[in-house]
From Swiss-Prot:
Gene3D superfamilies xrefs: 3.30.300.10
Gene name in the database record: metK
Matches recorded under SUPFAM superfamilies: S-adenosylmethionine synthetase
Record's subunit section: Homotetramer; dimer of dimers.
Protein name stated in the entry: S-adenosylmethionine synthase
Primary location group: cytoplasm
HAMAP family associated with the record: S_AdoMet_synth1
Amino acid sequence: MSEYSIFTSESVSEGHPDKMADQISDAILDAIIKDDPHARVAVETMVKTGMAVVAGEVRTNTYVELEDIVRQVILDIGYDSSEKGFDGASCAVLNGIGKQSADIAIGVDEAEEKEMGAGDQGLMFGFATDETDTLMPAPVYYSHRLVERQAKLRKNSTLPWLRPDAKSQVTLRYDNGKPVAVDAVVLSTQHSPDIKLADLREAVMEEIIKPVLPEEWLHKDTLYHVNPTGIFVIGGPMGDCGLTGRKIIVDTYGGMARHGGGAFSGKDPSKVDRSAAYAGRYVAKNIVAAGLASKCEIQVSYAIGVAEPTSISVNTFGTGKISDSAIVDLVREHFDLRPRGIIEMLDLRKPIYRPTASYGHFGREGFSWEKTDKTEALKAAL
């Protein structure tokens, strides 16, 4: 927020164990929803040395080869040998998936009036800010780009000693609410045992950090922490147990906006934890893109089995060109925030979810909730 003079956010790579779990859950969701767009899916994953455990509730008319999906995701990430601490080809895959509760289903199923109740109660937030071209907070945006580049250089063998697990953290200095300098960068990456620490640190600086961060933000006092603990050979599920839904701040706005607490991955769009958070981003981004405010946070809330949101509120942090209450009226006029309305507005019954499960659900083009197609209608209020 603008009151902070310094702000820090972090990200993790696709090879981080929690992100592995997210990607597995979303790959299973995609496989099911591809054949059965109206399926109900809530899939959780745990990964630890030598095994992946999948559990949850599913209601569907299709069948998917769950074990094959799990193995392929792990191999795609890059865990393909025991030398790396995990091998998707040989790990155990345990299946604990059951059916969706009939009590939940009855409140969510669509009635004749096209109403569809929310899959659960809860509160969700959406956010946008004009401090980057993507209308995302700069600290989390650049944190994502660092680990994304780490994965790219690992996969194309530019830095062949890189391994899949990595974390980044970026601390930015703000002046009048705008980022102006990098105070600190942390990048920890798993690596093969044959690379010297000095060589690793130099390569990470020259090939990952400097190409990603704006040169004009780097200064003589910027702190760089590259693998600050030294050796990082043991990583991934061998180093830490990974669970779906444990990186909800990485998935959203890096802590710069509030969070309702609900995770995204493994959940079909009838779950408002996911779909309403996507809608919140869509609404907030269009408000900022339309010039109604330079920063916008929206909160929506729901009751299980009820279609209409129990509340819609907006905070523009004093940057609004019109009042926050007037913006709420515009939101109600131009955006359908009932669960079915969100699904149709954002075309969410498609197998689009696995790519969201690494490097952030927001701020990347190609997702329907990143469109700014409502800006002209919203500008009419100015």
